[in-house]
Amino acid sequence: MIDFDGYRPNVGIVICNRKGQVLWAKRCGQNSWQFPQGGINDNESAEQAMYRELHEEVGLQPKDVRLLYVSKHWLRYKLPKRLLRYDSKPMCIGQKQRWFLLQLVSDEKNINMQTTKSPEFDGWRWVSFWYPVRQVVSFKRDVYRKVMKEFASILFTDNPLIFSASREANSLHYSANKKYSQTKYTKRHFYKSRGQ
């Protein structure tokens, strides 16, 4: 489903843990990382699409998370010309997204990126709250900056314990994350970093 302006309606999902870190997912077969996201079907609300994508991409059920906040507005980004499919009608020029902030309330062992025959991701890790804004692919960066700013005002204001833990985590994980982003990792590293 593509709107009259050429944007595909989409949901984005930010999952945080009790330390204020967020789940950062690695796209299959690529050294590219992002938050889970996916299209909204014709017969779905944005919230229904979010829970479907949550299960398909991350393996979590509604009982595994708590919905903290939904972005007030649709946020848009345009695709680079090299990613446009000029032969498709109607042509999609980008995504318009409604973003959801979730807190993981179950064990992280329930996270499973392999629930479908064609998974989107083949690895994940917890990163400090602002890390994704610096690391996401450039054409999504403005949307990530806006959504994380909006979510920060909710998450850190309403959850002082998370706020204090996150400040510490941000200072501890910045150098490690910077080093990590410059290194090519295999699946073995993901499991090792998670203590498995």
Curated annotation (Swiss-Prot):
GO CC terms in record: cytoplasm
Keywords (A to Z) from UniProt: Hydrolase
Annotated SUPFAM superfamilies: Nudix (SSF55811)
Pfam families named in the record: NUDIX
An individual GO BP term: mRNA catabolic process
The protein's required cofactors: a divalent metal cation
Sequence motif Nudix box, location on chain: 38-59
Protein name: RNA pyrophosphohydrolase
Organism, scientific name: Haemophilus influenzae (strain ATCC 51907 / DSM 11121 / KW20 / Rd)
